């Protein structure tokens, strides 16, 4: 019983530590969400935590919103076969 509990706890921690992270991307344009206030950023945090994104934390890094704790289903920059600003 203790072994099962330990295995479950380890799997949970692995999922938490290895959660997806990356730049939040606009699916229609292929561009990153821009921001100008580097570091802690209310806009980025709000966008990353939105229901359709599912992230746990967001901040402004290199003038774009970086998200942590994203589910695997959330798209991040770059999108395959879609370049920002190009058709």
Curated annotation (Swiss-Prot):
One of its GO terms (biological process) is defense response. It is found in: Secreted. Gene3D superfamilies: Knottin, scorpion toxin-like. InterPro entries: LCN-type_CS_alpha_beta_dom (IPR044062), Scorpion_toxin-like (IPR003614), Scorpion_toxin-like_sf (IPR036574), Scorpion_toxinL (IPR018218), Scorpion_toxinL/defensin (IPR002061). CDD domains: neurotoxins_LC_scorpion (cd23106). Disulfide bonds join 31-84, 35-60, 44-65, 48-67. Residues 85-87 form a propeptide. SUPFAM superfamilies: Scorpion toxin-like (SSF57095). Pfam families: Toxin_3. GO terms for molecular function: sodium channel inhibitor activity; toxin activity. Expressed by the venom gland. Has the structural arrangement of an alpha-helix connected to antiparallel beta-sheets by disulfide bonds (CS-alpha/beta). Belongs to the long (4 C-C) scorpion toxin superfamily. Sodium channel inhibitor family. Beta subfamily. Beta toxins bind voltage-independently at site-4 of sodium channels (Nav) and shift the voltage of activation toward more negative potentials thereby affecting sodium channel activation and promoting spontaneous and repetitive firing. This is Neurotoxin Cex4.
């Amino acid at each position: 019983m203790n072994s099962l509990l330990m295995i479950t706890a380890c799997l949970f921690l692995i999922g938490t530590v290895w959660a997806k992270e990356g730049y939040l991307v606009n699916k229609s344009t292929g561009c990153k969400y821009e921001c100008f206030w580097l570091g802690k950023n209310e806009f980025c945090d709000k966008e990353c935590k939105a229901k359709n994104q599912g992230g746990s934390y967001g901040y402004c890094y290199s003038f774009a919103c970086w998200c942590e704790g994203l589910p695997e289903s959330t798209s991040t920059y770059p999108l395959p076969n879609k370049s920002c600003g190009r058709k």
